[in-house]
């Protein structure tokens, strides 16, 4: 007989994610240096950047004023975090630092201009509110970025690789095109500034009349069902579009904005409205990008070797001679050697203290054992004396 009152454990039927693949996915944290001291505007930008980095980011992270960047780097390893995006503010500028956790390098940017999500929506005539677009990572599009470094620009490859490694790679052969819902555009201008734009992808079927498109849209959402109370017959609506009012006319779609995808399993409405030839041929979709923010204009200031400072690999405003670079290398070599020496001394001190603690513990144990033996021998002598009496 089964256990009465035993709680039933539901077994999930969907496939579990591969832990190896989960570990390979880049994860990020967007934090404010100094917490609320950066101001309200930069705090809102932090929130918008967290939405942009979804779903593999800490969306509800709460910073404290006492938290330091070193604390986040310490926790990055156990949590699997690969990148830290640190926003800070000085008296004159707002700054963004991208740190490759846990040991660097670090890319330091100056934020010249930025616009929040709410400001971008305010500029649009028909703003679109995202729904399920943040369940999948965005598609990264980079323009005017170099894969190979040169003597004049040794930092180009590192800059490009850093941005690419912040998001999971997309395979053209295996990625489902319907899972790509957002686009993150990074455009490198001639003056070296980087424009960041964030879009959601809106698709619309091509080759289908507007009345049929309205009916297909109404099948998914009741509020989109067209009003047919003025139409005598459904054919008047399908053939002539009677009953459609207040909608803007469709603009002509460019060929570059039209793609063909494999048609999924048709719905009942599609089977009734579309012909057999239309159901068999690939489905054409018109793609439109709708900006949702945030916007940023970044300038790369410098690149450092470590997560917390270290050797300066590149600086946009400071140019050193070969002799100065050699002196800098010698200084960092001495600092690294001194750091390793101190670490060895600390490890040796910890080992010695543990050995001393263990030795004292063993001596204490031996002392208790010897005292117990003496007590036992004394008890035996007293018992023998009592027997002779």
Swiss-Prot record:
Region feature (Disordered): 323-389
Biased segments, Basic residues type: 351-362
Pfam families reported for this sequence: Brix
Record-linked InterPro entries: Brix (IPR007109), PPAN-like (IPR045112)
Swiss-Prot/TrEMBL GO biological process terms: cytosolic large ribosomal subunit assembly; maturation of LSU-rRNA from tricistronic rRNA transcript (SSU-rRNA, 5.8S rRNA, LSU-rRNA)
UniProt lineage: Eukaryota, Fungi, Dikarya, Ascomycota, Taphrinomycotina
UniProt keyword Phosphoprotein, yes or no: yes
SMART domains per record: Brix
Protein name: Brix domain-containing protein C1B9.03c
Segments forming domain Brix: 28-309
Gene Ontology MF terms in the entry: rRNA binding
Keyword Phosphoprotein: yes
A GO cellular-component term linked to this record: nucleolus
Alphabetic keyword roster: Phosphoprotein
Residue spans of biased composition, Polar residues class: 379-389
């Amino acid at each position: 007989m089964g256990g009465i009152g035993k709680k039933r454990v539901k077994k999930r039927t969907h496939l579990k994610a591969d832990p190896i693949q989960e570990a390979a996915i880049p994860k990020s944290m967007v934090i404010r240096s100094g917490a609320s001291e950066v101001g309200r505007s930069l705090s809102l930008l932090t929130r918008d950047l967290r939405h942009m980095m979804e779903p593999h980011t800490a969306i509800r992270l709460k910073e404290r004023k006492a938290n330091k960047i070193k604390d986040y780097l310490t926790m990055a390893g156990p949590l699997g975090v690969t990148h830290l995006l640190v926003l800070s503010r000085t008296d004159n500028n707002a700054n963004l630092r991208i740190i490759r956790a846990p040991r660097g390098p670090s890319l330091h940017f100056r934020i010249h201009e930025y616009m929040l999500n709410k400001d971008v929506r305010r500029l649009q005539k028909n703003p679109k509110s995202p729904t399920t677009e943040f369940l999948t990572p965005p598609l990264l599009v980079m323009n005017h970025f170099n894969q190979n470094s040169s003597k004049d620009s040794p930092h180009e490859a590192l800059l490009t690789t850093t941005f690419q490694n912040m998001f999971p790679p997309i395979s053209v052969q295996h990625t489902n095109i319907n899972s790509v819902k957002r686009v993150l555009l990074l455009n490198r201008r001639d003056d070296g500034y980087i424009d960041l734009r964030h879009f959601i992808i809106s698709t619309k079927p091509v080759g289908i009349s507007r009345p049929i498109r309205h009916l297909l849209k109404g099948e998914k959402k009741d509020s989109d069902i067209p009003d047919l109370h003025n139409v005598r017959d459904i054919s008047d609506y399908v053939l002539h579009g009677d009953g459609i009012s207040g909608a803007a006319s469709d603009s002509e779609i460019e060929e570059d904005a039209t793609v063909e995808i494999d048609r999924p399993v048709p719905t009942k409405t599609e089977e009734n409205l579309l012909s057999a030839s239309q159901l068999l041929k690939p489905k054409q979709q018109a793609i439109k990008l709708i900006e949702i923010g945030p916007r940023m204009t970044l300038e790369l200031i410098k690149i450092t070797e470590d997560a917390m400072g270290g050797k300066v690999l590149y600086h946009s405003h400071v140019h050193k001679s070969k002799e100065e670079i050699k002196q800098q290398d010698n200084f960092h070599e001495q600092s690294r050697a001194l750091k390793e020496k101190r670490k060895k001394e600390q490890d040796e001190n910890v080992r010695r203290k543990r050995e001393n603690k263990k030795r004292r513990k063993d001596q204490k144990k031996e002392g208790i054992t010897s005292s117990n033996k003496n007590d036992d021998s004394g008890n035996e002598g007293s018992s023998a004396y009592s027997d002779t009496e």
